Amino acid sequence: HKNRFTICKLPRQSGKSTIMISYLLHYALFNPSVNIAILANKAATARDLLGRLQLAYENLPKWLQQGVMSWNKGSLELENGSKILASSTSASAVRGGSYNIIFLDEFAYVPSNVAEQFFSSVYPTISSGKSTKVIIVSTPHGMNMFYKLWTDAEEKRNSYIPIEVHWSEVPGRDEKWKKETIANTSEQQFQTEFECEFLGSV
């Protein structure tokens, strides 16, 4: 929460979406008039995340719920003035807006040219808001912008704080589970999606 720039390299099915949705919902409820962008490699994925956030909101006790001003597939606005937008990661997604949190989901799966255009277009928006948070979460997918940002964060060449989780930290995942998963998929797929290794190039 204290970090302005965070990058997370996480395995599949490790609860990353649930944790992020919970954090963003908490932030919107307890901070009035904030703008949050949920951006994913596909608009449908971002809308799905927003849908899950809306479901989490519905399951809150009534005393925690804010009044809802507008509620649709692409955005949510609360009575306290906080807004959450869901869109695909593109150069035009948040251009011209002012955001308190920009959450980039599965950033490694955003095509390299789009990822670069996004940052060159959006970084002025990020840097002008002195407290704007950028949270990048992804499973690796080749040597691309996510790879560069991650390795630079590890080497302290940028401002991102790197966070990673190993698949074995997820309850119920052991060597038996690993062997079964590899048998049902492939060694390479396991290395990328669960060991979170950067393989090949894109």
Pin down the residues of each PLM region.
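Short, flexible loop motifs at catalytic/binding sites
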Residues: H1-V202
